[in-house]
Swiss-Prot record:
Its biological purpose: Part of the high-affinity ATP-driven potassium transport (or Kdp) system, which catalyzes the hydrolysis of ATP coupled with the electrogenic transport of potassium into the cytoplasm. This subunit acts as a catalytic chaperone that increases the ATP-binding affinity of the ATP-hydrolyzing subunit KdpB by the formation of a transient KdpB/KdpC/ATP ternary complex.
UniProt name for this protein: Potassium-transporting ATPase KdpC subunit
Gene Ontology MF, one: P-type potassium transmembrane transporter activity
Lineage of source species: Bacteria, Pseudomonadati, Pseudomonadota, Betaproteobacteria, Burkholderiales
InterPro entries on file: KdpC
Residue ranges of the TM segments: 7-27
Record's subcellular location: Cell inner membrane
Taxonomy, superkingdom: Bacteria
Chief location bin: membrane
Topological category with respect to the lipid bilayer: Single-pass membrane protein
Record text on subunit structure and interactions: The system is composed of three essential subunits: KdpA, KdpB and KdpC.
Gene: kdpC
Pfam family, one: KdpC
Keyword Acyltransferase appears in the UniProt entry: no
Keyword presence, Electron transport: no
Length: 192
């Protein structure tokens, strides 16, 4: 009986060391060496201070900033610990109220409402934390942001164009604009 347990214990210790220590250590070292930025959360800095991550949206509701998608993590917007979809179906009155509330906020901020509102400005994403909007949603807000910052709309459009990322590998997903990066660039533009 003793001979039966010894190989099991040795196998357990070896596999635990391989899968619990060696493999995670090698993968961590590889990630830090090859994908340092991504392995550390894709953090963005301004003036030497971390202001956010490229991967998680932030709440912007002042007229001088581009607004991202609605957050589905209430009562604390963009709370990564509470990430989940809103689970509001198209017939749910709460979804309609949420959309109407965002449209009212866009109106109150002085957005030109003569054009159709891009859907990603009035709905939340699947995770509720999406940091990006479509180029159409960014273009929809250019006049408001330019007016609030006393900038030429063409200058703001050029900034949006510079921060628009195309499809991944040319085929995956859609073009998108990272709201935090764009707003940080706007703040830098104001300083410069």
């Amino acid at each position: 009986m003793k001979n039966l347990f010894r190989p099991l214990i040795v196998l357990f210790v070896v596999l635990a060391a391989l899968t619990g220590l060696a493999y995670p250590a090698v993968m961590t070292a590889f990630g830090q060496a090859v994908f340092h930025d991504q392995a550390n959360g894709s953090m963005l800095e301004q003036d030497g201070k971390v202001v956010g991550s490229k991967l998680i949206g932030q709440q912007f509701d002042a007229p001088q900033y581009f607004w991202g998608r609605l957050s589905a993590t209430s009562p604390m917007p963009y709370n990564a610990q509470g990430s989940s979809g809103s689970n509001l179906g198209p017939t749910n009155p709460a979804l309609l109220d949420e959309i109407k509330g965002r449209i009212d906020a866009l109106k109150a901020a002085g957005t030109d409402m003569s054009k159709p509102v891009p859907v990603d400005l009035v709905t939340s994403s699947g995770s509720g934390l999406d940091p990006e909007i479509s180029p159409a949603a960014a273009a929809y807000q250019i006049e408001r942001v330019a007016r609030a910052r006393k900038l030429a709309p063409n200058d703001v459009q050029a900034l949006v164009d510079r921060y628009t990322s195309g499809r991944q590998f040319g085929i995956l997903g859609e073009a998108r604009v990272n709201v935090l990066q764009l707003n940080l660039a706007l703040d830098e533009m104001k300083r410069g």
